[in-house]
Amino acid sequence: MISSVDHLIIAVNDLDQATNDYKKNFGISPCWKGRHNEFGTRNVLFNLENTYLELISPHEDGPGTDFIRPLIERKGDHLAGIALGTDNVELVKENLAKNIDGVEITPGQSIKEIEGKKRKWKTLFLPNIL
């Protein structure tokens, strides 16, 4: 059912500063700088050997900002999530929905800041009870 660790998500308060810090630590530049208009967040991606690291920060009003801003205020910059990959998100949803209420698939999109290029995916947010 789960096929990979797709990526790690680090919530940061200052995306530009964190980008510079991780750039120095990894010795590589990010491959993507974008925004999630529907969530109100901005992000930067660093490609690693078989996964990637996503830095995400509050930017504008939206559910993503509403979720991560209080976490950053409480914990500072921190590991906020692990995205797992699957070949069949609908099957995963079906199996989880047998025991957990409110499991829904949400479309996601990031728009690259300079070129306007888009990345799209499906997300299945798991409740905090797990």
Tell what function each PLM region has.
Residues L15-Q17, L53, G62, V89-L91:
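Generic "edge-of-domain/loop-turn" microfeature
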Residues S4-N13, V44, E49, F67-L130:
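Vicinal oxygen chelate
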Residues N20, I56, T65, V92-E94:
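Short acidic, gly/pro-rich beta-turn/loop elements at beta-sheet edges
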Residues F26, N50, I100-D101:
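Structural motif
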Residues S29-L71, K117-L130:
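Conserved short beta-strand elements that form part of the metal-binding/catalytic scaffold
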Residues M1-K33:
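Short, extreme N-terminal leader segments that mark the start of a protein/domain
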